[in-house]
Amino acid sequence: MSMKNKLKNFFSMEDEEYEYEYIETERESHEEHEQKEKPAYNGNKPAGKQNVVSLQSVQKSSKVVLSEPRVYAEAQEIADHLKNRRAVVVNLQRIQHDQAKRIVDFLSGTVYAIGGDIQRIGSDIFLCTPDNVDVSGTISELISEDEHQRW
């Protein structure tokens, strides 16, 4: 009995494995057939070359704020604009010289802290820019020595 069962099991296992392999290959050919039937364009993926744009290069509209402070306390508002990544043109013509100098000192520190830049663009007029704004070129102006010594 044992020898007969062993032979029977031996031959029956081969048959089962063969059937299993046959089913396996049948599934593979069925999967290949399904892949061939799928359309070339998938709705989730665009066909062809993809154009990728960095999100950092797409910005909201940039703003330039014009400010004409009358007192030193308004310097903090200007600094807040710079922290919000907005360029600010500061006109200091209507403020006393000592107050104007304090404002320029305060804004210089603010601009340094955020990695920006401050430039004099006219008599008592300054351009303060955050790090996301690049200023190119210069404005040449004939300034008398008295005004030049003021700053």
UniProtKB/Swiss-Prot annotation:
Transmembrane segments: none annotated. It is found in: Cytoplasm. InterPro entries: Cell_div_SepF (IPR023052), Cell_div_SepF/SepF-rel (IPR007561), SepF-like_sf (IPR038594). Residues 24-39 have a biased composition (Basic and acidic residues). Cell division protein that is part of the divisome complex and is recruited early to the Z-ring. Probably stimulates Z-ring formation, perhaps through the cross-linking of FtsZ protofilaments. Its function overlaps with FtsA. GO terms for cellular component: cytoplasm. Gene3D superfamilies: SepF-like protein. This is Cell division protein SepF. It comes from the Bacteria. GO terms for molecular function: identical protein binding. Homodimer. Interacts with FtsZ. Keywords: Cell cycle, Cell division, Cytoplasm, Septation. GO terms for biological process: cell septum assembly; division septum assembly; FtsZ-dependent cytokinesis. Signal peptide: none annotated. Belongs to the SepF family. Residues 23-53 are annotated as: Disordered.
